[in-house]
Amino acid sequence: MTTWTCDTASGRAALEIAAEYADASLLNHSVRSYAFGAQYAARHGLSYDEELFYVSALVHDLGLTAPFDSHTLPFEEAGGHVARVLTAGLGWPADRRARAQEVIVLHMRDDVTAAEDVESHLLQVGTSADVSGLRVAEFEAAFTAELLEAYPRLGFGASFLALVEDQAVRKPDCAAAAYVAGGAAQRIGANPLDQR
């Protein structure tokens, strides 16, 4: 069985922190986002920094959790700061810490290509697949089934929608607000991953 982890000190620390602060539904989403992105990279022959991508994926939504939810910053920026602090504690150099932050901030944009920023693109692909089912049909059914068995959804669609709708109300100029206004509820509700 595939584990979809990055077995480095930084990878283990990111998983530990994510498990401590995210509920099981959000934690599983983070792992699935990494897995979808890594699988996409393998299918498209994309080279990327596995540890950077994994750590960023595991903590990318911690800005949605109560301890890290900023009253002024969009959740992806708050999550980027969490990544920067976490990776500083792990001894990452300043430029790599900044990359972790950037990967998380840019994952909310769908216009970042793999050529521009491969890790940000992979996180965007992975999160879009998991949140709204975008590109899910491109993944092998056996891969998706194994992933969902190992990291079940646990009502993720409804809980995530509630989190981003809350962000949209409190921070009307953030990317989450634009996402909600653009039909997030319909896209999340139609996710084929929840129709299984």
For each predicted feature, which ranges?
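Short alpha-helical hairpin
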Residues: M1-L15
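A generic, well-ordered mixed alpha/beta core segment in the N-terminal half of proteins
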Residues: L86-I104
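An active-site-proximal "capping" alpha-helix that borders the catalytic cofactor pocket
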Residues: S33-A35, P74-L90
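Active-site flanking loop/helix segments enriched in acidic
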Residues: G11-H29, L62-T65
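Divalent metal-dependent phosphate-bond-processing catalytic cores, especially two-metal-ion Mg2+/Mn2+ enzymes
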Residues: M1, Y21-L46, W92, R109-R196
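Short coil/turn segments at secondary-structure boundaries
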Residues: A66-P74, G91-W92
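Alpha-helix N-cap and coil->helix boundary residues
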Residues: N28, Y48-Y54, P74, D95-R99, ...
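His-Asp-centered metal-binding catalytic motifs of divalent-metal-dependent phosphohydrolases/nucleases
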Residues: E51-D69, G79, Q101-D110
